[in-house]
């Protein structure tokens, strides 16, 4: 049969990006160049593998598959079902749990939606949850609100009450959390963080959840790769539900997973009968059709590939080095006289206080960007406003993926220290009536030979390390 449409149309759909859309292709190449020649210290970022990219760019993206394996709303899903089941099996294996005790949803599209989907599955509107206070290292999706405004949609749909860290130590104040939880009686206790560098005491969290009758939900988005590798403790022994993104330390595609308990939850003290978990159907229903339509099948395939990699000895070697590199950050910052929130790290990142240096995180972030270092400004305990964050968050996973070791991370800290000193000089040079952030940026944008020199050094140095594309 002849091809009905024109040859031009055939060429349109079969030609590569460089030929059909050079403008988009050029921007992509510019971004690859930036990644190749920059030091990426964003704690939530990583560089995924070539094989994950291979899986992402496949015709699996063409297929609609609303529903779950064996129960789809469309035909033609034989191979899509195989892929999703494989991904689920690999997810359980990667985190060392078995299907008799745990199930997993791999369709959820991202971390914050995954958390909302869990809440909606097990709570009615305006029921209560508790999560770590955002400026103390928590996350928006754990119910953040200010005195005057509900910031996260979670805090709009549900009532939230934060727990805090001890302001002296920077460690979660479990005693106060327990007292407040018993009084507040949340339906869900969230154990998870986005800028907390110490290990969470999951056993204590379980005890607190039991005392107030709450589900214990662990959000391991930042540390799931470390957990899969077995280099830090796992929450699965204690949690009822575990959520994670898939693109941070796990080093997969951008996505998320929701793990949920199966089997016996408790024994009824009056009847002696087993009380079973009822999480699987509510969570799956919350994901689809509650919040989503068709899943992203190309992402599920890429996640399956990443999970296979996460079960290898090479992945454990990588995560072990991540911890070593984070400790290298800790030691070098301390040697230079910086204060670290919680006095250090047990994980993949450090949170550096800049209050003692007389500058804030936004200014240091801006200087670092000028010299090809990507990190992020971050609130620290005691900050009065998220608009003036008192610190910077610095992570090790991305540059560890590219092959950097402890000595490289010592050198990175030296450059960050130079950026802090440069920021101090710029800020001190500004008149009192023109010292806002926009004034600071304008002054920096006037140009500096020193910044240009540092940028060239980092450009060349970062370019020595491989970048998978």
Curated annotation (Swiss-Prot):
* Modified residue annotations for N6-(pyridoxal phosphate)lysine: 248
Alphabetized PROSITE patterns for the sequence: SHMT (PS00096)
Q: Which CDD domains does the record match to this protein?
A: SHMT (cd00378)
Q: How does it assemble?
A: Homotetramer.
Function of this protein?
Answer: Interconversion of serine and glycine.
Q: Which family does it belong to?
A: Belongs to the SHMT family.
Miscellaneous comment text of the record: In eukaryotes there are two forms of the enzymes: a cytosolic one and a mitochondrial one. Present with 67600 molecules/cell in log phase SD medium.
Protein name per the record: Serine hydroxymethyltransferase, cytosolic
